[in-house]
Amino acid sequence: MALELLTPFTKVELEEEKKESNRKQIGILGGNFNPIHNAHLVVADQVRQQLGLDQVLLMPECKPPHVDAKETIDEKHRLCMLELAIEDVEGLAIETCELERQGISYTYDTMIYLTEQHPDVDYYFIIGADMVDYLPKWHRIDELVKLVQFVGVQRPKYKAGTSYPVIWVDLPLMDISSSMIRDFIKKGRQPNYLLPKQVLDYITQEGLYQ
């Protein structure tokens, strides 16, 4: 994996590297997915297409390594909603290793596990431009960048910089958040068109976020 490459990084270069190595190129989009929404799906799909990845894995976290722990629903509901959201969607799948491992979901531990399980795969870890600024604070970041290629998602013309190797992908801003959807539901408003209909139907059926 070419960790020395910085922005700009073209799809053509990535495709050439892929052809030469014959290794699988897999993206990872981690998150709480509480619930999953359309912006998550657009990011995963567009990164897959723009970088020519074989697949993008949506990876629900167990406990995020944040000081302010997030309030979240049971993992079985988050997983069911993920399954519904990507049903019949090409190129997207689910990775559950962090849920199975339990405890705090450190990306370093996850990538050690995945690279040992799948030594023929190059992993691309997708994060927002705002998270790029926090890379120096990530757990064992200097070792982590040797295991995974970071992909930063930014708005067109948005300028972000980092000393760490990051591939940049431009995407239009979609101002959708899980907290917004939860707030809509709590207030009795239907978050139509913000998340897949089958996910909204599941939320209604299970009485979530009331």
Swiss-Prot record:
Entry-linked SUPFAM superfamilies: Nucleotidylyl transferase
Keyword annotations of the record: ATP-binding, NAD, Nucleotide-binding, Nucleotidyltransferase, Pyridine nucleotide biosynthesis, Transferase
GO biological process terms on file: NAD biosynthetic process
Pathway in which the depicted protein is active: Cofactor biosynthesis; NAD(+) biosynthesis; deamido-NAD(+) from nicotinate D-ribonucleotide: step 1/1
GO terms of molecular function: ATP binding; nicotinate-nucleotide adenylyltransferase activity
InterPro entries per the UniProt record, alphabetical: Cyt_trans-like, NadD/NMNAT, Rossmann-like_a/b/a_fold
Catalytic reaction annotation: nicotinate beta-D-ribonucleotide + ATP + H(+) = deamido-NAD(+) + diphosphate
Broad enzyme group: transferase
Entry's EC annotation: 2.7.7.18
Known function: Catalyzes the reversible adenylation of nicotinate mononucleotide (NaMN) to nicotinic acid adenine dinucleotide (NaAD).
PANTHER family: NICOTINATE-NUCLEOTIDE ADENYLYLTRANSFERASE-RELATED, PHOSPHOPANTETHEINE ADENYLYLTRANSFERASE
NCBIfam families reported in the protein's UniProt record: cyt_tran_rel (TIGR00125), nicotinate (nicotinamide) nucleotide adenylyltransferase (TIGR00482), PRK00071.1-3 (NF000840), PRK00071.1-4 (NF000841)
Family classification: Belongs to the NadD family.
Protein's name in the database: Probable nicotinate-nucleotide adenylyltransferase
Taxonomic source organism: Streptococcus pyogenes serotype M18 (strain MGAS8232)
